[in-house]
Regions:
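Short, intrinsically disordered terminal segments enriched in charged and Pro/Gly residues
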Residues: 1-10, 19-24, 28, 38-85
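Short, low-complexity, polar/charged sequence segments that are solvent-exposed and flexible
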Residues: 30, 38-39, 51, 118-120, ...
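Short cysteine-rich clusters marking metal-coordination/redox-active sites
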Residues: 11-14, 32-35
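Short linker/helix segments within small regulatory modules
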Residues: 20-31, 116-124
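Short loop/turn positions at the edges of beta-strands in beta-sheet-rich folds
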Residues: 24, 35, 105-107
Length: 136
């Protein structure tokens, strides 16, 4: 077994770390494979961090949900635009893209929420708010 330490990148959206890939460097724009967020890489004293590339914009949430759906193989239905509108409203009111169908505004409910990232779509066919759907 190798003693080489694998660098990991901290994602401020899903609060998880993912593996640093060869060819990436400070300033690289990468997509978190866990939540789909576009991140700009930054090296800190504690390791690698991804800063949100388009924080607070409609582009940020649209890119995130599109990337997440592509990564997981999910699809959207006709309520997508209503949910994006709800996510924008949550950002304006509470400071982040919290699930518009949940009353709690905590980090684990940033879209895509932790239950969705944890397999709700696979188990139930869709996420809590109906944004992400399992392909049939």
């Amino acid at each position: 077994m190798s003693d080489t330490k694998v660098d990991r990148i901290y994602c401020p959206v899903c609060l998880a770390k993912f593996k640093f890939s060869e060819g990436w460097s400070e300033g690289s724009v990468v997509v978190c494979p866990i939540c789909g967020e576009r991140l700009i890489l930054r090296k800190t004293a504690d390791g690698w961090v991804g800063d949100r590339a388009d924080k607070g914009t409609e582009k940020e949430i649209r890119d995130r949900i599109e990337s997440f759906a592509e990564i997981r193989g999910y699809v959207f239905n006709d309520v997508k635009e209503d949910i994006v509108e709800g996510l924008m409203g949550k950002y304006k009111r509470f400071g982040d893209f919290y699930c518009p169908c949940r009353m709690e505004h905590v980090p684990e409910y940033q879209c895509p929420c932790k239950p969705t990232r944890g397999g709700d779509v696979e188990r139930n066919g869709k996420c809590h708010c109906g944004l992400f759907w399992k392909k049939v």
